[in-house]
Amino acid sequence: MRAAQLFTLTTLALATSPYLQAEEDTTETGREQTLQTITVIGTKETASSAVKGYVAKRSSAGTKTDTALLEIPQSISVITADQIKDQNAQSISEALRYSAGVTAEPYGVDNRGDYYALRGGSSGSVVLDGLRLPLIGSWGSVHDEPYAFERVEVIRGPSAVTYGQNPPGGLVNLVSKQPQKTAQHEIAIQGGNNDHRQVAVDFTGPLDQDGTLLYRFVGLTNNSGRQVEYAKVRRDYIAPSLTWLPDSKTKLTIYGQYQKDESGNTNAFLPWAGTRLDAPGGYPKISSRLFIGEPDWDSYGGQRTRIGYSFERKLSDDWTLRQNLRHDNANGHYTTMYADCCGWMGPRPSDRTVNRVWYAGQPTSDVTSADLQLEGKLNFARFEHTLFFGVDSAQERSTNPSVSGLDPTPFDLYAPVYGRFAEPVADFGVISPTRTTQVGISVQDQIKFDHRWVFVAGLRHDHAKVTVDDSASVGVDESAWSRRFGLVYLADHGLAPYLSYSQSFEALAGTDFYGQTFKPKRGEQYEAGVKWSPIGKPYMLSIATFQLKEKNRLSTDPNNPQNQLQLGEVTVKGFELEGNARYQNLEVLGSYTYTNARDTTGPVKGTQLESIPKHSASLWAKYSFALADISGFSVGSGVRYLGRNWGEGAVIDVPATTLVDALASYTQDKWSFSLNAKNLFDKEYVATCLGRGDCWLGTRRSLVGSVSYRW
């Protein structure tokens, strides 16, 4: 099996090599020819602009300044809107499937949110246009709609200097679609298996003849099923925005967003036996369509509103002032049932039945985030400085009341009977809000010497405070300094080796079983790598190796399962390879990740971290035909290798699997037609099994047809 998987990946890689070699041959031949001068009129790429194809050259994700990716001493991926569209990503987690250093969808079919692990860490933080989203996560949240974004940027490794509190593995920055000066309109309709139905619109352009007022409106409605029965999904989303350009030095954008999600629950927490292990009594594997809740009671979703603005003023040719503010309000609900199988390390007590646990929660969150940025450029002799000074804050008021209990009625996993559950009255009692505040001050200098050397240094101070209203428990009040240093050498032919050191800081709310507060979680990383992106060529290749250490990681107390100890320390050593390229009509992107993530001091010392594979790889290619008789046709295919992973303490493993995706599309004038297949061969697999006794099944085949009209 491994040989077949490696052969598939190698074959796809070799299939693309003649095109890349042809580019080199053409370049060499061109040196001996006198070519006609051609004037090209286009839009210069910026850190937030749309990108044609899959290759982005600039980003602000790593520095909060508009910087070439070659000059950032950190591993960063940019997933463009074209890639999201071509791969028909229906969630942020799906958009991350082909990125290096990311364990996407570790819980398989899970509609509770976007889950992924960066460099062996827990799910990374998410920021929207550089501003933090809720600081305290909870079940019942509304996760983001990928159609709304121009880019999804993955910043790997500690990023406290740039963003404040975040896990050491990294974070994801979502870049919203912005109003444009050129009028563009799109209407897109989708339909597919599992009753997938979706209509989306994206309109933008000027509102006046002078182009001082620009607008954008993004809207979507989705009414679909899932591979799990009774888990219907309904989403409504609108995002209007308006940009005012009173002069060439000033820009103000005001925006809003409303999203409402309603669905059944896809999560089942299925037992080992019947998923990863053989079912007892000669029964078959548990169906991936099994709904383990109650159709008339289970619900998951909520609504979210956002409103904010971004302001930019050029004070001079060298200095720019930026200010951003956003308010997020979210109200969720989560009523569900799942299998009571935690703690079982073998077959179920019965051949075909389990008991179920019921859960009800109503999380809420109000977050106000703001920042003030000053960027300046100073030149001294052979030195070019890009200075950045920033102040940011985030204030959140959240509640997460929940109750749960055990339903003693046995549930048949092979012939489920619904309607016998006596719905409980969820009494949440007195609800005490949690208030979280973060304030950070940062300074950074990007120094370029002789157009060859780039040195990046940054320093940040964070103050984080967490309190619970009407509670006698001790809150969190922590401060910390974080640093980053990096060096890049800009060699000839677009080659850029680099070294970097960075830190992370994250205050941990709550106490242990005995009432003692937790220390902040800290992380530090050493990274070395090479990037390659020739000037004027749509190529971007990056290679990185790193060692990341996380301190004060929480671990379960082996003597008291209800307690958590801060004895854990995790060391992650890894290697990542990622490349994006376009040659004429061929677009290719690929990645390979090696992650050795081990607990070095906890109760399961020396074992690979739960759900994190050591090896993973992916390759995607799209070819657009240019011949007259088939002009407008495109075909694409991708291979995803998901390596073997383990439950906590390596008590159970999940075998590796290889999945295939495919695309066929046709564009004629203003019309586009496409068909996407994900998990083309409908492979049934287990995504993850936890050491406590439960497993998650992977996503089955998805077929979606799309029709869009653009003008």
Language-model-derived ranges and their functions:
Residues 450-452, 547, 566-649, 706-710:
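Gram-negative outer-membrane beta-barrel transporters
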Residues 243-247, 365, 384-396, 432-550, ...:
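Structural signature of Gram-negative outer-membrane beta-barrels, strongest in the C-terminal barrel
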Residues 55-76, 81, 93-132, 150:
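Extracytoplasmic beta-strand/coil segments of soluble accessory domains associated
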Residues 312-326, 330-336, 497, 521-582, ...:
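Membrane-embedded beta-barrel scaffold of Gram-negative outer-membrane proteins
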